[in-house]
UniProtKB/Swiss-Prot annotation:
Its main location: membrane. The chain crosses the membrane at residues 8-28, 36-56, 61-81, 109-129, 138-158, 172-192. It is found in: Cell inner membrane. Probably functions as a manganese efflux pump. The lineage of its organism: Bacteria, Pseudomonadati, Bacteroidota, Bacteroidia, Bacteroidales. Belongs to the MntP (TC 9.B.29) family. This is Putative manganese efflux pump MntP. It comes from Bacteroides fragilis (strain ATCC 25285 / DSM 2151 / CCUG 4856 / JCM 11019 / LMG 10263 / NCTC 9343 / Onslow / VPI 2553 / EN-2). It is a multi-pass membrane protein. One of its GO terms (cellular component) is plasma membrane.
Length: 194
């Protein structure tokens, strides 16, 4: 993957963090830097760790399925993208009440928003990323972008509330990005792989 593709993938994966952070910001209602930084830290941390775990698990058996790895990467990214697009059309109350600053809630949200990153880590193994040092760069970018987008989402939610959050459709755009990356991987392997 190119640097641009990694950054686009990171943005796509961070859309769940952005959406959850906007909802959390709506509930927080005022800037509280400590809980906001803690939330953004955990979102970024889990988004960075999950691709490593997915890659580690899949890299142990990737040699067994090399002939279909591009199909697997495409299927994973298309499924995740499709799910994100579907979720973007659900009518849910973005002002739903919970305490987003409690550590238990923060960790639960961080794990829930990083499941997609775990699947992406699996697809990294199928794309030929062979060494731990090669996976650290994309994982770091994914974590950084998720941290940054979470912080932006919190501030955005605090400032603008529910009306804007519904119009943003962050999950829709994240899903589209994941599907496009999966399609590109499939086309490259089918038509341009020697």
């Amino acid at each position: 993957m190119t640097g641009l593709e990694i950054w686009l993938l990171a943005i796509g994966l961070a859309m769940d963090c952005l959406a959850v952070s906007i909802a959390s910001g709506i509930i927080l209602r005022r800037i509280q830097w400590r809980p906001m930084l803690i939330m953004a830290f955990f979102f970024g941390l889990f988004q960075a760790i999950m691709p490593l775990l997915g890659w580690l698990g899949a890299s142990t058996f990737s040699h067994l399925i090399e002939s279909v790895d591009h199909w697997i990467a495409f299927a994973i990214l298309a499924f995740l993208g499709g799910r994100m697009i579907k979720e973007s059309f659900k009518e849910e109350d973005c002002c739903q009440r919970f305490n987003p600053a409690s550590l238990k809630v923060v960790i639960t949200m961080a794990v829930a928003t990083s499941i997609d990153a775990l699947a992406v880590g699996v697809s990294f193994a199928f794309l030929g990323i062979k060494s731990c040092s090669s996976i650290l760069y994309p994982a770091g970018i994914i974590g950084f972008v998720s941290f940054f987008m979470s912080l932006i989402g919190l501030i955005f939610g605090i400032r603008f509330g529910c009306g804007i959050a519904r119009k943003l459709r962050a999950e829709l755009w994240g899903g589209i990005i994941l599907i496009l990356i999966g399609t590109k991987i499939l086309i490259e392997h089918l038509f341009f792989n020697n």
